UniProtKB/Swiss-Prot annotation:
Example GO molecular function: heme binding
Subcellular location: Microsome; Endoplasmic reticulum
Alphabetical keyword list: Endoplasmic reticulum, Heme, Iron, Metal-binding, Microsome, Oxidoreductase
Keyword rRNA processing: no
Annotated source species: Takifugu rubripes (Japanese pufferfish)
The name this protein goes by in its record: Heme oxygenase
GO terms under cellular component: endoplasmic reticulum
Stored PANTHER family: HEME OXYGENASE, HEME OXYGENASE 1
Iron listed as a keyword: yes
InterPro entries linked: Haem_Oase, Haem_Oase-like, Haem_Oase-like_multi-hlx, Haem_oxygenase_CS
Length: 277
């Protein structure tokens, strides 16, 4: 009898969407944590330039995600996991961007093309398949909630920040107990009714979410490698953003930044053979 109960419980656990996502994304999760940008965080070596560029991309990603979550908040697949008061990140990122870039921070945002692709996908599924938002909300929000406090302390120490200003993104004042809240969130997510086809698609979307994050991290690192210590990063853009290819990666940028980037690339071509196409 006890064995039957354990088998039944195990079967139910294996059917939980949260457990299935965790299982199918295990390998790609490790890859995401092994990117150069994330390793800098883990080693306590994150720089101000790294963090500022990361914040710019996080702003665009959460802008897309939270607009689509808000728009689909009554959808049967989204409503159970819609927790704007507890999880919304956009306002916290805006606060951090203003701290680092000043009141005109919106004119100084620079993001790689990988970020644009990520955002495009979120908006696309928000329009066509809102149930896929489950995958992006789960991987983003619970990932940030799980590592937020630790990464916040690492960032504060690495960048030698005196207080919590600039680190609002890592704080979840609406969540008194992260562990209890994550349990509630998973329970709500597991309660969403999906067909087998939809469930399979959500699992694939979760894999895609991690792949998008890896691409963003890699593109950001390429930008940092080329523009380290250059004043062009974060300069105002007076015209619509354009794209530039660096080492096979398309980077979303502005005319002034592109000029600085091009000069840096020319020097790099002479010294290490890096060619801008």
């Amino acid at each position: 009898m006890e064995a039957d109960k354990k088998t039944t419980a195990q079967t139910e656990s294996n059917r939980d969407l949260s457990e299935q996502i965790k299982k199918v994304t295990k390998d790609v999760h490790v890859r995401a944590e092994s990117t150069e940008l994330m390793l800098s965080f883990q080693r306590g070596q994150v720089t101000l330039q790294q963090y500022k560029l990361l914040l710019c991309s996080l702003y665009e990603i959460y802008l897309a995600l939270e607009e689509e979550m808000d728009r689909n908040c009554d959808h049967p697949s989204v409503a159970p996991i819609y927790f704007p008061a507890e999880l919304a990140r956009l306002a916290t990122i805006e606060k951090d961007l203003e701290f680092f870039f000043g009141p005109d921070w919106r004119e100084k945002i620079v993001v790689p093309a990988a970020t644009e692709r990520y955002c495009h996908r979120i908006r696309q599924i928000g329009q066509e398949n809102p149930e896929y938002l489950i995958a992006h909300a789960y991987t983003r929000y619970l990932g940030d909630l799980s590592g937020g406090q630790v990464l916040g302390r690492i960032a504060q120490k690495s960048m030698k920040l005196g207080g919590s200003e600039g680190l609002s993104f890592f704080a979840f004042p609406g969540v008194s107990s992260p562990n209890l809240f994550k349990r509630l969130y998973r329970s709500r997510m597991n309660s969403v009714e999906l067909t087998e086809e939809q469930r399979s698609a959500v699992l694939q979307e979760a894999l895609g979410a991690f792949e998008f994050n890896i691409q963003v991290f890699e593109d950001l690192q390429k930008m940092l490698n080329v523009t380290e210590n250059e004043p062009g990063v974060g300069t105002p853009r007076s015209r619509p953003a354009t794209t530039l290819q660096v080492g096979g990666s398309m980077i979303q940028t502005n005319p002034l930044f592109r000029m600085v980037l091009g000069l840096c690339l020319a020097l790099a071509t002479v010294s290490i053979g890096l060619y801008a196409l």
